[in-house]
């Protein structure tokens, strides 16, 4: 059997370009989430609007599930990812120019929904089967890490001391039009999207022939339902779909609960509460790497008890009121989540 280091050495360089593009795109998505929460609070919107941001973001994933796969397969994957990032930049720009954060973040979600099948599909085109577990470890680890780091960066950008320092920078003879904390944060987040788009341009061609697929929406819906039923009838497919659906659903909910919990239990403001989530990134990275190293596809279901343990530790967080105790527990939760979700 090949060692993990030998397998990693066989991964072509283009794979890391794909990972870099994915990292910066996901990083910007989640930094934008904090900027959107800040924008809602600045406009004194009802507090229940904040979790609705995630609902509006993921709406496209549900409504367009039957169509985004066909779109991703209709052209080279790098072009799909580039177009998707352009849509995200449009959503970020809408928020900058005063559109309601819920509407603007929904546009970003449209880009993310189109991006998702391309980022996974290109791996199967570009890498041999034996490298897919390692590749999935990278993509899940970097994605979750980008989620956490993006929230930290978003929280940092809205800190009064940091934001005022950044606003003090200016270009001679040029009026940038960036005058508020929100505009400054959105400008920097837009740069992250541009970096991701530049990486997309250097994603290697996989050599796969992209033929125009059927575009009839009724056919695509029928085909989607057929594939979905096949997955649910497969024993391992059932486990993978059920577990990952619950995992990401709970994770999206916890993203907002942790912020509110930090404000109530630890007396932290939005900036510090969002940065507290960053400590989870350490555990996520360790867990994802460990899963890629030790867990094969045949052994993937063996990680399910770790998901149960993770849930129990999340329950324990109800009784934590000190930051020195919260930090190691959040790192542990991150480690378990990274080790748990990669094989699934």
Which ranges hold each PLM region?
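Juxtamembrane intracellular "pre-TM" segments in multi-pass secondary transporters
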Residues: 2-15, 205-242
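Helix-loop interface residues and adjacent transmembrane-helix termini in multi-pass membrane transporters
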Residues: 12, 43-44, 74, 98, ...
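Substrate-agnostic recognition of the 12-TM MFS/MFS-like secondary transporter fold
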Residues: 13-33, 53-72, 76-89, 104-161, ...
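Membrane-helix interface/capping residues of multi-pass secondary transporters
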Residues: 15, 47, 77, 129, ...
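Transmembrane alpha-helix termini and helix-breaking/packing motifs in multi-pass membrane transporters
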Residues: 34-44, 93-97, 149-189, 264-266, ...
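C-terminal transmembrane bundle of multi-pass solute transporters/carriers
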Residues: 51-56, 60-70, 74, 78-80, ...
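Transmembrane-helix signature of multi-pass solute transporters
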Residues: 87-97, 195-199, 286, 312-316
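Helix-loop junctions on the cytosolic side of multi-pass membrane transporters
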Residues: 121, 125, 179-182, 186-216, ...
């Amino acid at each position: 059997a090949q060692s993990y280091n030998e397998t990693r050495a066989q991964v072509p360089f283009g794979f890391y370009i794909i990972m870099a593009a994915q990292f910066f795109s996901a990083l910007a998505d989640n930094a934008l989430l904090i900027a959107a929460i800040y924008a809602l609070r600045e406009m004194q919107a009802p507090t229940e609007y904040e979790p609705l941001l995630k609902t509006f973001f993921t709406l496209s994933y549900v409504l367009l599930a039957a169509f985004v796969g066909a779109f991703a397969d209709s052209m080279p994957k790098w072009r799909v990812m580039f177009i998707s990032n352009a849509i995200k930049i449009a959503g970020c720009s809408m928020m900058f120019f005063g559109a309601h954060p819920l509407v603007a973040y929904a546009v970003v979600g449209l880009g993310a929904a189109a991006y998702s099948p391309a980022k996974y599909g290109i791996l199967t085109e570009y890498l041999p089967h034996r490298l897919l577990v390692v590749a999935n470890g990278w993509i899940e680890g970097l994605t979750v890490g980008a989620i956490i780091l993006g929230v930290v960066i978003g929280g940092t950008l809205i800190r009064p001391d940091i934001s005022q320092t950044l606003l003090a920078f200016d270009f001679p003879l040029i009026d940038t039009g960036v005058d508020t904390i929100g505009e400054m944060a959105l400008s920097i987040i837009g740069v992250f999207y541009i970096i991701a788009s530049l990486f997309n341009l250097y994603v290697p061609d996989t050599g796969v022939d992209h033929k125009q697929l059927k575009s009839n929406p009724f056919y695509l819906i029928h085909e989607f339902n057929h594939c979905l039923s096949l997955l649910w009838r497969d024993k391992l497919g059932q486990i993978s779909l059920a577990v990952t659906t619950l995992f990401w659903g709970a994770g999206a909910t916890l993203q907002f609960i942790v912020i509110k919990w930090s404000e109530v239990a630890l007396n932290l403001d939005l900036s510090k509460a969002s940065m507290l989530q960053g400590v989870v990134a350490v555990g996520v990275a360790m867990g994802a790497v460990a899963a890629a190293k030790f867990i094969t596809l045949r052994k993937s279901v063996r990680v399910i008890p770790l998901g149960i343990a993770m849930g129990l530790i999340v329950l324990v967080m109800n009784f934590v009121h000190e930051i020195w105790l919260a930090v190691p527990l959040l790192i542990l939760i991150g480690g378990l989540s990274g080790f748990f979700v990669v094989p699934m």
